[in-house]
Amino acid sequence: MGAFSKETYVTRNFQKISGKRWELYVITRVIHSLNDPDIEYVCQQYIIPPKNNEYYLADLAFPSLGLYLEIDEGQHGDKDHKIADIKRDAEILEATDWECKRIAVFLKKGNTKIDKKLSELNNEIDEFVQYVRHKKETLIRSGVKIEWDYEKKFHPESYIEKEKIERVKNVTANKN
């Protein structure tokens, strides 16, 4: 195989968000609660919409499930940011066909934003985890294979055999 192991990949994913305390909290709770090695995830998934030169980073993406999670910190409560989020979500949908779910880590009290209590936030995270599990089960029942074969994902041969690469399939390969 190429550059690094699945273990290194997983821990580097968390390292990418170590400076964002709420994002780190929510994402690590989601992943540890899921405890499912067959569900691929990516922190800070890079997404380029087809109609502009900007790019977006999805906080937590589940490519095989067609799903991503945005963790809304305080700035997402501002009117301008809410409008930007709507545009962003529409462009990500167009680029990936992925469903977006959001978890806000703050409450708005008048003009003030305060952090949610961990117990309330944990309940929302647990609901999201149940949603992810249900989505996986639904896809499997419809005949979709959900398996995170880390080594295969990064081998170009996997895509050469298919003789086709689709932009929305989250293709990745290591340079050997």
Predicted regions and their residues:
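Nucleic-acid endo/exonuclease domains
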Residues: 1-176
